[in-house]
Design a protein with these regions (language model features):
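Hydrophobic helical membrane-anchoring modules
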Residues: 1-23, 168, 192-257
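Short, well-formed alpha-helical segments that are part of the catalytic scaffolds
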Residues: 11-17, 34-48
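Hydrophobic targeting segments
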Residues: 24-30, 39, 45-46, 53-57
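Conserved sequence signature across two-component system core domains
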Residues: 32, 57-59, 80
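Donor nucleotide-sugar binding loop of glycosyltransferases
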Residues: 35-38, 61, 115
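A conserved acidic beta->alpha catalytic loop
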Residues: 58-66
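Acceptor/aglycone-binding surface of glycosyltransferases and processive sugar-polymer synthases
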Residues: 76, 80-82, 86-99, 104, ...
Length: 257
């Protein structure tokens, strides 16, 4: 069966109607690497009235990320025996959610950049059957990016233009990790998250690109992304910028599927 026709462009912010969201159908997936001091806050902030299960995937941290997540009340903590990358962490979390019978997954950053109280923004279009994948955008009206460094602002503004050139979809924020989607999409043989080349930053743009390419209904909604003064980014700009671009190049040219 072909997926429903996607809705191009970004619609207006959905009304936050918690009553429409059944948390028993939702898992929040949180990839984390050396996030001690932050991961506990993330877990505690996830309202269980929107997501019944928080799945933290610890990508072989050298600190006490796993213990802190458990102490904060994470329903599932999965630890990789070796460091594999954020994409592998997301994949593990999604597969765990799917295996446990959840219908929807919301992905949140483990470094406390996202606002879990905004989960209704990414979940409501799914429960209303208006979208199959809902992408958060800090650049839509109603979104925000307080404290964003100038280099990150530049990257997150240029990338959507390249995504649009490659896919035809008018994305405004394809690098934002706050999103939610139907886990049934992973049953589509055209969406192959189990490829090793997606282990790091490639997986998220791959998923978005393939959702568009395969005709799923993709929608953007405004969200907040906060940049904290403490800590340093784990991104290495030139290398990881290529990792974000690689799925667009490989899929557009047919090098990968």
């Amino acid at each position: 069966m072909s997926p429903p026709q996607r809705t191009p462009g970004a619609g207006p912010p959905p009304a936050a109607e918690p009553a429409v969201i059944d948390p028993r159908r939702v898992a929040a997936v949180v990839p984390a690497f050396n996030e001690s001091g932050k991961i506990g806050d993330v877990v505690r902030k996830v309202p269980r009235r929107y997501a019944a299960c928080v799945i933290v995937v610890d990508d072989c941290s050298s600190d006490d990320t796993s213990d802190e997540a458990r102490a904060a009340g994470a329903e599932r903590v999965v630890r990789h025996p070796v460091n594999r990358g954020v994409g592998a962490g997301i994949r593990t979390g999604l597969m765990t959610a799917k295996r446990e019978g959840y219908e929807f997954a919301a992905i949140l950053s483990g470094d406390d950049q996202h606002e879990p109280d905004e989960l209704p923004r990414v979940l409501t279009p799914l429960f209303r059957d208006e979208a199959d994948l809902v992408q958060g955008s800090r650049w839509l009206p109603g979104g925000a990016a307080p404290g964003i460094p100038s280099d990150r602002r530049w990257l997150t503004r240029i990338y959507p233009l390249l995504f649009r050139l490659a896919s035809g979809y008018p994305s405004t924020d394809g690098t934002n990790g706050f999103r939610a989607f139907r886990l049934s999409m992973l049953d589509d043989p055209r969406i192959r998250l189990d490829q090793d080349w997606l282990d790091r930053y490639e997986l998220e743009p791959y998923l978005l690109y393939q959702a568009v390419r395969c005709g799923y209904r993709v929608r953007e909604v405004p969200v907040t992304v906060r940049y904290h003064a403490r800590g340093t980014t784990k991104m290495h700009w030139f290398r990881d910028a290529w990792r974000l671009l690689r799925p667009l190049v490989y899929l557009r040219l047919g090098i990968q599927r």
